[in-house]
């Protein structure tokens, strides 16, 4: 089950709560939206083994992806204006039934 909600404090953030009964690698794919005053920029995130791929329409933006559970883990990709996708390597993600993923466009 996937539940999407926007962080009340900022329209820049789209928080996605993942509920699963397996382990962290059961996260398959989801969509994020960057909400701005002018338009919404769409981004897709997909997970395969230890690789987390994030692709955006506006590739010039920097992507920061964090997972918050019992421990805090961060994933980030530097600016890659020439590319339409960024590959983020996950060191590890704490196994938990609930993971809160946040995607920020900075």
Curated annotation (Swiss-Prot):
Biased segments, Polar residues type: 24-35
Extent of Low complexity compositional bias: 36-46, 74-85
Region (Disordered): 24-49, 65-87
Protein name: Uncharacterized protein At1g31060
């Amino acid at each position: 089950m996937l539940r999407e909600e926007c962080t009340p404090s900022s329209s820049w953030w789209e928080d996605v709560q993942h509920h699963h009964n397996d382990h962290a690698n059961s996260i398959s794919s989801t969509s994020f939206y960057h909400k701005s005053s002018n338009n919404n920029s769409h981004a897709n995130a997909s997970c395969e083994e230890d690789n987390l791929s994030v692709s955006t329409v506006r590739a010039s933006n920097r992507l920061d992806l964090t997972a918050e559970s019992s421990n805090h883990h961060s994933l980030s990709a530097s600016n890659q204006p020439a590319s339409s996708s960024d590959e983020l390597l996950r060191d590890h993600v704490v196994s938990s039934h609930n993971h809160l993923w946040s995607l920020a466009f900075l």
